[in-house]
């Protein structure tokens, strides 16, 4: 695998409320994905914060500075990917509380990049099978593991780790935001917009699913790595095996507290 690809990156979106978990997240990205030399970008609105400065100085994170108008949950996704350097073609967006605590499958990451290189019809490849593709979804290429997401799947779009063609990720959030503004015109404050983005969850429910299935036409494909089995830890047998959702309803989960202490990056949240 060409682990030094300059056209791939990891993109983290975060806001000051959640900065305290970022050092643990990025430190473990560097520790457990040490052979993966993709650039890491943090899209956020307070670049002068001491934690942001530490991420830059200690871990080589590059900042994408957002305005206050771009700091909403959905708005920040669009602005973050839109402000990446022009040489970035593929992006792996991850939530700020997704913690990688084991080595990724470098061969599968390389294969995902290669698929995007050679097949313009592929817009994304889901790396974490949570949810996994339906068992009867068609195989993308005979002899390969990737499945094509279809109407059998409840979720085509998910915030779980997915490698995206940058222009398709941008197009999705651009259209999603236009639809949200049209269908939720009364959501004007930061809290109201956050309610639509998270509580209504317009991206991961039928609204976003239907949009993604039609965006780009019938030729556009979204692939997913299959789940190894029905047991709960099967999700970690995947190309990017992170611990999802370290913060739930504004509370730091116990596993994240323990992980931070064990790894030497305690989280005060």
Residue ranges of model-derived segments:
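Conserved donor-nucleotide/metal-binding helix-loop-beta segment in metal-dependent transferases, i.e.
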Residues: 103-132
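Short, aromatic/basic amphipathic alpha-helical patches
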Residues: 25-29, 50-60, 138-145, 191-194, ...
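Conserved nucleotide-sugar donor-binding
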Residues: 157-174
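Short beta-strand-to-loop acidic/aromatic patch adjacent to the donor-nucleotide binding site
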Residues: 88-99
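Short, flexible, basic/aromatic active-site loop/helix in glycosyltransferases
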Residues: 139-154, 168
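Short acidic, S/G/P-rich loop/turn micro-motifs used as interaction or catalytic elements
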Residues: 16-20, 47-49, 98-101, 132, ...
